[in-house]
Amino acid sequence: MTKYPGIAFFKWDCNSPITNIYSMYLKENQSHLYIDYVRGLYKVLDRIKAKYPDLPMMLCSGGGGRSDYEALKYFTEFWPSDNTDPIERLFIQWGFSQVFPSKTLCAHVTTWNRGTSIKFRTDVAMMCKLGFDIKLDDMSQSDHLYCVQAVKNYNRLKPVILDGDLYRLVSPYGSNHTSS
């Protein structure tokens, strides 16, 4: 970031869990390994935020495993899962929103599950911080125009989506549809 000061965004992507669950330094305190790991991570993040206080950072949480309220001191948002299938994201986002507000969650429109319409994929991603991971050149003109309008609508509705009250009406776990 020092070499490229124009960087506008930082993603902490750490999808590998600790696999060798032993530390020769902890000796009889092996049960402290995960706690000490997180404390060490936060020390690293303290240094990054001290050096780059205005740099937005996203935590890629690998399925929610590293999302916690302490992390919000450092990260502006969480990426809850690399699974961007919009049907699966309904379940992921439903569960994530039980603990964290919409403004902390990112969801992107992708090409996963092309059997669903661009409208459905966009509607699901608009439930939180909307993004697109999709090649515009691969989209039909009508889908592209729809996305342009959807972004305009999202920007208009963003204060309600990110800061409004969320009411859960129908769980995706109890039926073949959901509503929030």
Residue ranges and their predicted role:
Residues 1-119, 123, 127-144:
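Active-site neighborhood of glycoside hydrolase catalytic domains
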